[in-house]
């Protein structure tokens, strides 16, 4: 994931007031600081459905969410040359360090051999699970819906609001 100035355009502003010098006049005693929230997000995905994965990333950027992508990248050699154990360990390390897990609640999720493991890992480390219902999907995965802390629709605003409301506050 790359970071640019544009990542911080629509940041969440939090103001803190602190005492600078008690001898100053009251209106000069305070200073306001703005913090930028950076989320660590694991987006569960099947590389067969990588366009949905890309769309989730674009939803987050579109809504001004500054985030570090904790997902295991497609070009990681573990995907092609590694064992299931190595991939499982890589996913667990990524989930352990994230603020929240986003899972597409499409029917394919029910048949993915990794979804249950990712859900189990998220629960093990008390990571909130955000389920996103794919646009126009008639059927969704009960496995994902039952594990989710929140289920949102297929649009940028609802995905971004879920991240803001459910992600665990962590610093990079």
Predicted ranges, named:
Residues 125-132:
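A short helix->loop->beta-strand "cap" motif at the edges of active sites that frequently abuts
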Residues 24-97, 172:
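Conserved N-terminal substructure of TIR/SEFIR domains
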Residues 16-17, 23:
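Short, positively charged and aromatic/hydrophobic N-terminal segments
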Residues 136-151:
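Glycine-rich, charge-decorated loop segments at or immediately adjacent to ligand/cofactor-binding or catalytic sites
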Residues 107-124:
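Conserved TIR/SEFIR loop-to-helix hotspot centered on a Trp-containing motif
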Residues 160-172:
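A charged, well-structured terminal subsegment
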């Amino acid at each position: 994931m790359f970071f640019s100035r544009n990542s911080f355009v629509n940041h969440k502003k939090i103001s803190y007031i602190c005492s600078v010098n008690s001898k100053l006049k009251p209106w000069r005693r305070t200073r306001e600081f703005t913090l930028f929230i950076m989320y660590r997000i694991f987006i569960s995905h099947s590389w067969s459905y990588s366009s949905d994965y890309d769309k989730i990333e674009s939803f987050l950027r579109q809504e001004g969410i500054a985030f570090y992508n904790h997902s295991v990248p497609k070009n990681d050699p573990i995907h092609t040359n590694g064992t299931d154990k190595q991939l499982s360990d890589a996913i667990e390390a990524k989930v352990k360090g994230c603020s929240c897990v986003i899972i597409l609640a499409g029917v394919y999720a029910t048949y993915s051999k990794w979804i249950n493991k990712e859900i189990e890992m998220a629960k093990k480390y008390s990571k909130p699970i955000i389920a996103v219902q794919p646009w126009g999907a008639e059927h969704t995965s009960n496995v994902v819906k039952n594990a989710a802390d929140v289920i949102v629709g297929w649009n940028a605003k609802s995905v971004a609001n879920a991240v803001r409301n459910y992600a665990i506050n962590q610093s990079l």
